[in-house]
Structures are given as C-alpha cells and as structure tokens.
C-alpha cells in the first residue's frame, strides 16, 4: 500500500479551446506559443476527436491568466478553433503517491468521496503518481477534509 499525500492548489485558472481542428501539429503549435510566452501549463485534458475536431483544456497559474488569454485568443483565430472559454474560480485537488498503479481503485475512491460531498469534478488528469481533479474553489476545504477521512491510514505524515 502506498502512502498518499493530498495537495490542493487554488491559484489556477482553466482555459478551453473549443472545436479545434484535430490534425498533426496543432498541439505543438498551441503549446509552443504558450511556452514562447513563458507560460507553464499545470494540467491538460483533451476530449476525443469528433468529426475531425476536438476540445483542449489547460490549467495555468492564475498570475498567467491574462497572458494566457491573449495567447490563446490569437491561437483560436489562427488555428481555426471555434471558441475560447476561461474559468477562474477553480482549484486542483490531487492525490499523490510513488506509484498509483499499485493501489487499484484509488481514483474511484477519490471520485466517490467528492461525489458524496456534492462536489462536481470539472476536469480530471492522471498519471502513474497523481490523480488530480479540478473543482469549484469554494469546495476545497470540504474536499480536503473528506479525502483525509477516506484515506486515513494511507496518508503520509506531514
């Protein structure tokens, strides 16, 4: 059993490019522009392509929100995306471990715990060492308390 840590970050902003062409080079172009502007992407989720188009959502540090909006608005026009949206009042809640692949069901437990608290998950990113849920920032304290209760005994000492 892994020792888990719960990390929260309320200092982020979510952007989504809607109905972006699904073709080689689009991601390189989009993330190249962000990198050239000195913007670090914190999280990324892409929807499966439908009819050759897709949505791409990213999270960035709130301090980079205005710069990100400008870069992505230009990208929207030049890359033929049909829209750009921004969400400011979001937070990331993450479960971190050395290897989540050794603990089957951790993500499901996290999702069930948040659901039981009435907390909607806006975006999910996951890898071998972390599962991160983007939620409404108002619910961070409740999410943290609920996850601490659910994972008692698995949490790394602070």
Could you tell me what each predicted segment is?
Residues 1-158:
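A conserved regulatory-domain signal marking ACT and ACT-like small-molecule sensing domains
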């Amino acid at each position: 059993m892994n020792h888990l840590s719960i990390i929260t970050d309320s200092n982020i902003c979510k952007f989504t490019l809607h109905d972006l062409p699904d073709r080689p080079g689009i991601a390189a172009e989009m993330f190249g522009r962000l990198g050239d502007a000195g913007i670090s992407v914190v999280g990324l989720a892409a929807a499966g392509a439908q009819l050759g188009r897709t949505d791409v959502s990213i999270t960035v540090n709130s301090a980079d929100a205005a710069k990100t909006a400008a870069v992505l608005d230009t990208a929207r026009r030049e890359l033929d995306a049909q829209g750009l949206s921004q969400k400011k009042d979001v937070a990331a809640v993450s479960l971190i471990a050395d290897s989540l692949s050794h603990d089957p069901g951790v993500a499901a437990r996290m999702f069930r715990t948040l659901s039981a608290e009435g907390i909607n998950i806006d975006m999910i990113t996951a890898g071998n060492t972390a599962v991160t849920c983007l939620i409404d920032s108002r619910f961070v304290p409740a999410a943290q308390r609920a996850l601490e209760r659910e994972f008692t005994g698995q949490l790394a000492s602070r």
